[in-house]
Curated annotation (Swiss-Prot):
The keyword DNA repair applies. HAMAP family: UvrC. One of its GO terms (cellular component) is excinuclease repair complex. Interacts with UvrB in an incision complex. CDD domains: GIY-YIG_UvrC_Cho. This is UvrABC system protein C. It is found in: Cytoplasm. The UvrABC repair system catalyzes the recognition and processing of DNA lesions. UvrC both incises the 5' and 3' sides of the lesion. The N-terminal half is responsible for the 3' incision and the C-terminal half is responsible for the 5' incision. PANTHER family: UVRABC SYSTEM PROTEIN C, UVRC/OXIDOREDUCTASE. The lineage of its organism: Bacteria, Pseudomonadati, Pseudomonadota, Gammaproteobacteria, Enterobacterales. One of its GO terms (biological process) is SOS response. Residues 204-239 form the UVR domain. It comes from Yersinia pseudotuberculosis serotype I (strain IP32953). InterPro entries: GIY-YIG_endonuc, GIY-YIG_endonuc_sf, GIY-YIG_UvrC_Cho, Hlx-hairpin-Hlx_DNA-bd_motif, RuvA_2-like, UVR_dom, UVR_dom_sf, UvrABC_protein_C. The keyword DNA damage applies.
Amino acid sequence: MTDLFDYKEFLKTVTSQPGVYRMYDTAGTVIYVGKAKDLKKRLTSYFRAQVANRKTETLVKNIAQIDVTVTHTETEALLLEHNYIKLYQPRYNVLLRDDKSYPLIFLSADEHPRLAVHRGAKHEKGEYFGPFPNSYAVRETLALLQKLFPVRQCENSVYRNRSRPCLQYQIGRCSGPCVEGLVSEEEYQRQVDYVRLFLSGKDQQVLTQLITRMEEASQQLHFEDAARIRDQIQAVRRVTEQQFVSGDSEDLDVIGVAFDAGLACVHVLFIRLGKVLGSRSYFPKVPAGTELSEVVQTFVGQFYLQGSQGRTLPGEILLDFTLTEKDLLASSLSELAGRKIQIQSRPRGDRARYLKLARTNASTALITRLSQQSTIHQRMKELAKVLKLDEINRMECFDISHTMGEQTVASCVVFDANGPVRSEYRRYNISGITPGDDYAAMAQVLKRRYGKALDDQKIPDVIFIDGGKGQLSQAFDVFASLNVPWDKQKPLLVGVAKGSDRKAGLETLFLASEGEGFSLPPDSPALHLIQHIRDDSHNHAITGHRQRRSKVKNTSALEMIEGVGPKRRQALLKYMGGLQPLFNASVEEIAKVPGISQALAEKIHNALKH
């Protein structure tokens, strides 16, 4: 039992209604969140002489306080529980580390609707289709739609400024609604309807309508139109034959689970209207001693009930594990979706084959992850020895990227005991410094990163600075000046200087801003881990810098030309159909723009080319 908490007095005050409880340690940190149909009965079970398992025993020893929130129903309690888990990330709960929203295909409600990739909250008016397991899958689908149905995919800002069609029109991927007379309103809306039907899985309706139109065109002797529609029919048929995998037209999520060596993998197979859209593997954080049933139960709850993810709920969820709270989860999901959602654990036929596939994928992904972790863990141990630390649970690395001091971007990448934590990678746009001053850039990013309150688990054990003694000295100065509530002495600051000719394996490490550095053997596992985090940081920084530089280049190219003000910029973009066509235009073409003289056209052409 716990000496920190007078549970007997507390239990006297607890109601038998449904609700949610939050357990705190001595530091006031939430360490566990749970829900109960009967709060008194559930909380009493924690303080019996014989607790359920080792995890519960460890949890109870750390309880210093319990807060209770009473709810009207058990369904309300379930929803609130998962909201609290997401908010507090308690260390004794199973945690789904998935803070990225799923990509969807968005069909806007504009006069001429556009197709686009969408993530996050559904604020914009229109229709949303998905979810897709990753951005690659959704972009592949958009590229396919562009080949089948010539509906625009350009941004509204580009669409409104066109006076002639773009390249997509020239190659038959867009019908050109931006330019009057290229496509009728009726025909464009018909293609939009085809997209809507196709994304809803109603391929046969699309084919039926196209066949009817082809026959009508042929009867009216419009043979060119009939041939064009015939080609569209053949393209749609090819796609549907390739993608159709089941006679079942319902939406399914199929969830397979594998568990070994304290690590769980949950693999989700997304099936929409008989088509496999893709799949994704998840590795939830599992506290020691947690039962597999709790892992699956909590995963399903967090995956579907944490509403900010923007997921579209399927009509049915298939599991290879029987949930103790299946009915409660199903009713909660049905209430959330506004329609009936079923959870099945003993499917037959095609569903059973899907489940076997999901289970196989989970096992394969788990084997791969365990192999990777074995390597990472070995490297972590070697690095801890080199740096004379007891253990390393979290590392962060910083790098600076710029071109001649312009568009400076700093990156921070994070590794934990299992390797890269990409959801915590960050970029920082650097401003207000002398161009090219890497020391000032490093000082700025470190102040922004660490000059604030941090949770204990977010304080790194090691901070790598990409650079030599100068960069490391800046880091020491920044940390000396920090006035923060957390232990700023905890992180070990390490400078990583590149070797001669920037060759891998010749890096020099510095633990102090003065004195000599030291090198590790080229085959050292510790060095390989340092190279891994350093390279990730470098790539993250340079990618951000290139994106920023490209954006500035494209937006400022015209602004820097003398004699080209806002009105002329607008006229140039509208007449030429965008910035890229303007870059490719000749002097004669530019001179045709209203308000642009021959001399100014030459100046614009020379400025854009050079």
